[in-house]
Every structure is written in structure tokens, then in C-alpha cells.
Amino acid sequence: MKTQTKKSNITSVLCMILFLNVTYPLFSQNAGLPASALFGRKYKVGDIYRYKLTMEELHDGKFDHTNIAICELKVIKDSLGIPYDEVRWISRKTINTKDTIDATKAALSVKPYLISLDPKGKLDIPKIEVPDMTEPIQDFNTFFVAVSPMVGATKLNIKGDSIINKEPVIADFSNGSFILKGEDCIAFSVKMTDITKNQVMILTTFFPPSKSCLSFLIPEMNTPVVPNTINNFQMVMPTGADKYMVQYGREYFYVNSTIQKSDGKIINATMFNQLNLKLKINCDKEYKNCQFEMPFSEQRNLRLEIL
């Protein structure tokens, strides 16, 4: 029984810090990249609109919870005349197997921040000052990154056009606190899957590269958690006095986006995110003599829709 409790606690901690804090600080800058005449974002100062972000999460294949958050965007210009969306979060709730938790207070506590799909703008993730809003803020940013100039989306012109990034991106998401060591290695591609009179459909895929760009913390990380796929994720968290949890494995995700040609707004989008890990619990400072090991998988199904 004690072991089960520890496993449950470890899983809960893990799920708080996964995903987009890993990859996207490296894709924050738009400046100097081309716009798209076909579906590039056309901003109108003063325009106000809202998005609903829904995320369903499964642990080891079983439903765990659903998060629903709503944000409001207002188009402004910065001091350089570059258009931005000012993002304000206005509500959030979590639905699990037992009850519904209202986290609107946390959503309203997030300071407004700016993001832009303009070629001269930025898509920086803001400093996270409200921990309960970490996931929706980062997920929302991902949907914008997936159709941005940084991944090459604005270079696509006709159905079937695609771009594959040949150089993997490595990100360090260590924070010196509850993430003592954290790295992720991702390659990505973007493809125009369809085009209609009024809309463009884009598929952006983030996946493990063919060769690792990580220096693994322990030799066994060279053995794939998922057969025939390199491990591209590693992380160390403290679990007690001179005790640590080591996690490693495979992460990938893809985003299907529908963009309105007239103004370049994302009308709706879906994201599938899968993480398959091996957890080593309560290890010593050399990450040996661990109390136990366990596999863990997390699947997240997300949907963004304009309101």
C-alpha cells in the first residue's frame, strides 16, 4: 500500500511539470522571418476575441482529468509599432472523476502578456507567476508556434508543401529548484494538408530526431524506452534528503490547425501529445540504488477553438 501511495504521488508531481516548458523558449523570436500572403496574420488594432482551450489527460491509458480554460485577446501595438495580441486569462476549471474544481481565481491572477504572429513580433512564454496556470499558458503558446514563421509555416503556399527541420532543437528546462536537470531534444516538420476558399489547414509535428542531441545522465538512458526510437527526454527531481527521481524516455506531439485566410486567425486546432517514460524513484546522488522503477505514460488531447 505504501508503495502504491508513493507511486501515485510521484505521478502527480510529474504531471505538473511536463511538456511545453521544455521546447518553446527556443522558438520565441519571429524577427526577420517571412510573412505569408496566403494566410499570414493581419492584425486590426482594437480587435477583441476569445479562445477556449480544452485538455483531456490520460495516465497509463486511463482518464485522469480535463482542463477547460478561456482567454481573451486584444490587438494592440507596442512602442515600435509591431502588432501583438494582449492575452488575458478569464477562467479555468478542472473536471476529474470525482468533482469539478473552479480555478477562475488563478486564471484572473495571471498578468496580461503579449504574443504575436507578425514576422517582427515575438512568441515568448511569459514568466509563470501563477503555477496553476502553467499548463494552459504553455499549451496556448504552442498552438501559435505551430503556425508561426519560426517553424516555416509561412513558407507554405500550396497543398502538399512541407518543410522538415534537419537540425534538432535541444532545450534546457532546469530551474534549480524542483527540476534539477531537464532536457528535451526535438525535431519538427510542418505541412499544408489542405486549402479551401476561406481556410488553410496546417500539420505541425514535433518528434525525436534520428540521432540524439542529449548527453545522457546515466548509461541506461541509451536503451530506448520505446523500441526503435531514441530517448529524447531526461529529467531529475529531488524527492527528499539526497534522494532523486530520474525520468527519461520518448516525447512527441503534433498539431492540426485550421487558419482563416482573411485575417490569419486560428479558427480551431487540435494537439496530440504522448510521453512514454521510465521512472527511477528515490535514487542516490549518482542516480543509483533506486528504491524502485516504474514505467509511466501520459497522453494529452487538446482542442483550441475561437469563440
Model-derived features: where do they sit?
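Bacterial Sec-dependent N-terminal signal peptides
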Residues: 1-35
